[in-house]
Amino acid sequence: MFKAGVVGCGHLGKIHIRLLNQSDNFDLLGVYDNDVNISKKAASEFGCKSYGSFEEMIDEIDVLDIVTPTSSHFSYALKAIENGVNVFIEKPVCSNTEESLKLVEKSKLNNVKIQVGHVERFNPAFTAVENNISKPMFIESHRLAQFNPRGTDVSVVLDLMIHDIDIILSSVDSPIKQISSSGVSVISDTPDIANARIEFENGCVANLTASRVSLKNMRKTRFFQSGKYISIDFLNRESEIVEIDEKKSEIPIMTLETSDGNKKKIYFSKPDISENNAILEELNSFAFSIKNNKRPKVDIYDGHNA
């Protein structure tokens, strides 16, 4: 078991604390928060130590879990890395690319592992169809949320859209050719609604929309590729696959005839979705990568690129 500590005891921080306590891979030693009262309350609730300083905590742990506002990610991560501590950082990894690039360099220099909390990579609706995604040529994502003041320290791109950016970058094996985007601030001081079009060198195009001032919640991504359409509902944890398959013997849901007389058999399927906790899965995945000296599934490079 890895000795773990959590910095940040807010809403999401307490979720991480609870799950680290549940995991067989971690021994949660304690927590730290700038607000000592919040730290003591969380420590009492979860039966662990409330550290009086961040420096005291990183001297005793193997793994640091950073669940604080984005602006503080870099300073906490840098101190931990320089102390030889492996780091899990909630997304976005940093406030800017200069900071994340420095963490990339420091992690290599100090031989520690960093995983970034792009939790949708562990969403069972995505993992159920991940192996079906192959050379998509058009991708469309919508991530809409009702307003919540948590997360408004950064734009909707770093708050919400970054999840879909990471999913798309992990699914398209091609460099980016061009990005065009627009955004507007509605309530907060940073953009609350944004749209981006990402063009890849292999011809794939991704269109992303994110809003945190919506009347309803939605987290859907659709992949279009040769002979197959894949739809993922991250919110409701459902996936659908529609594909053309001439080799199947089952009765298709429909048969389409092209202008030249060719008949295409269309099949529909809904994969079984597991009931796993995606945050617990990503934390356990990080423990596996440390134990086996493997690259984390969502490492610092992925966080930096997103």
Could you describe each region identified by the protein language model?
Residues H16, F46-V104:
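Beta-loop-alpha module in the N-terminal Rossmann-like domain of NAD(P)-dependent dehydrogenases
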Residues C94-G151:
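A contiguous active-site-proximal alpha/beta segment in oxidoreductase catalytic domains
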Residues M1-E45, I168:
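N-terminal Rossmann-like dinucleotide-binding module
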Residues V63-T68, E281-A306:
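C-terminal helix-rich "cap/oligomerization" subdomain common to oxidoreductases
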Residues I165-V242, N276-N292:
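Contiguous beta-strand/loop segments that form the cofactor/metal-binding neighborhood of enzyme cores
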Residues G52, I89, I114-V116, E140, ...:
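Hydrophobic residues in well-ordered beta-strands that form the structural core
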Residues G117-P124, F147-Q178, P191-D192, G303:
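Mid-domain beta-loop-alpha active-site segment that forms a flexible
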Residues C48, N83-V85, N110-K113, C204:
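A short helix->loop->beta-strand "cap" motif at the edges of active sites that frequently abuts
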